[in-house]
């Protein structure tokens, strides 16, 4: 019967909802009370096999897992776990090998430039030959091989040398730590007297040549004497305050030329004496053999260049495949990439704690120096190799669709998400001046011209400088903390705090941009950078750096989101990938690379603390200049046309990442929105300016107030100039508006496309709207506009 059939009493809407639910469920509708698809009844044994709680848990946690996205999550976790366990510690490892800050900065910074150039090349190769999976696996294999090669480099020799330089002036010498003074001479006859001999302070006698080898605290003295034939002097070591040990003693007699009568003939005796002295520990220091350090530096540089060229494209390819898996739900990319940040933080913390409990014995050439406490960083390379091998195994499960593999995405190293589909018809797009028709005429050179303007060029410069600061911090923060006796456990805690702050800023960056605007977010980022760098420069205890690590999210994640969103709003969707690629190159490529290399040179000459202080002051100067430029040269109304950023990807990755889901507010053509705006609230200054009882110009007694007031007047004059330009263009816009509401004598009715067009397109800025209000009549609400349009047919009949 129909009354017993539960499906028969469902309405059409309920039937449609049920059909959508069944199609959306990947397991065809497993619920808490499963019903058979037909009139069959399940057996009691099958019903009792799966308990109610177990079915509910499976449905919530396991049923809707996408296997493809699970592979991406696991890959990101292992890959960034390997990356985070090794690369933040590489500068400290280079320091332990004896390299200078400039050498370490070059080894770290050159990776960004090679990566920026090689990733597009391998992307084109993978797309052209349809070998994306082969290129991916080969690049991951290069990650393992070339980075493991760095970990097994033999460190340079340590030598113990005195801090006080010797009094003798060095001459040409082949060894950097060998001091060869000028030829000295002693008296022709050396007796076995017991006079004391001070350290390298021999009297200038004829026939003595002394070779001092500083690093070993060892003196090799060669005595060339011309003794008398009858009484050959005996050479004995001096034993007053210094212990001399004769290593080798050889005599090479030779016959001297004939001498005048009355003089005796002499023989030449050469003696090699090596003296070993133990100096107090406060008078000696450890140095590296510079020739060995330079050889190690060149070997690692070649390994880094070759390895980075072959391995730079791995993350770009995986980003592209992951976005293909996501399909139209590409705004969830950040949820996949977040697993990489989780793995980075956990691996860095675990490895840092583990290294603190390892020590290696160092062989020192010389005596008197205290052995340094060196860590065994080979453990880091072993962990890196294991984790990257796991990522390589996971990468074998990726599935590639080559018909969706785009060169443009790899070339720009960005994956740009298209906007919401426009619902306007073809007839409307031909007659209505939409943003799409405008963007077709917007070529690449217009993009370059736009980005070179004062408004957007200043934002690009700030993006480059923030990348410069991030590259410097990534390379030399742990270097500076180790100088303050910081441990690798501290480095791991710093990494966890910075990643937590970046994830937090990632989730709330779009809310912050919506609340205060893009430019003010850049202000806050520059101010936080200033406070952070100056604070680090005055540290005395390494652990006190932790409070400032929470600013990493503001100084990097929020800045990245604001720059991406601000520049994407300025260009049409067709050129948005190019704009984001330029920003990617300036921030992640050129910015970080310059920060590592130029920062290394500055640290080498001025020290880490002074360099942090200098970059902090530079941040303050750039903040003031940027604020002045935005205040004078950029109108306030530009902020109303910005684009809010949703789901900006986690920007802690040092490799290229995708940019996703930029939601545009003002140019949506889906449905016209009726959003009446209240008149802007006037400031106190504007009220005083409009008050007829007060003079138009008032000079304050304070010179600073007068100066600021003069700058404000200059800004108002520049604003008035723009208003005049807008008023000159306004009649053309009025003509386009008349197509929507023609005058009474027009005699033509507006078409359906003009009726539903977005009025915001005909009014590009609130400033132009204000100019039209002052020229014609006050603006009326949208409802009154529609009433006038309804009254047009009667007027058109006349």
UniProtKB/Swiss-Prot annotation:
SUPFAM superfamilies: MFS general substrate transporter. Gene3D superfamilies: MFS general substrate transporter like domains (1.20.1250.20). Belongs to the major facilitator superfamily. MFSD6 family. Residues 25-50, 671-696, 732-798 are annotated as: Disordered. The keyword Transmembrane helix applies. It is found in: Membrane. This is Major facilitator superfamily domain-containing protein 6. Keywords: Membrane, Phosphoprotein, Transmembrane, Transmembrane helix. The modification Phosphothreonine is found at residue 11. The chain crosses the membrane at residues 74-94, 106-126, 133-153, 295-315, 344-364, 378-398, 459-479, 488-508, 516-536, 553-573, 588-608, 614-634. Residues 38-50, 760-780 have a biased composition (Low complexity). It comes from Sus scrofa. One of its GO terms (biological process) is antigen processing and presentation of exogenous peptide antigen via MHC class I. It is a multi-pass membrane protein. GO terms for cellular component: plasma membrane. The keyword Transport does not apply. Pfam families: MFS_1_like.
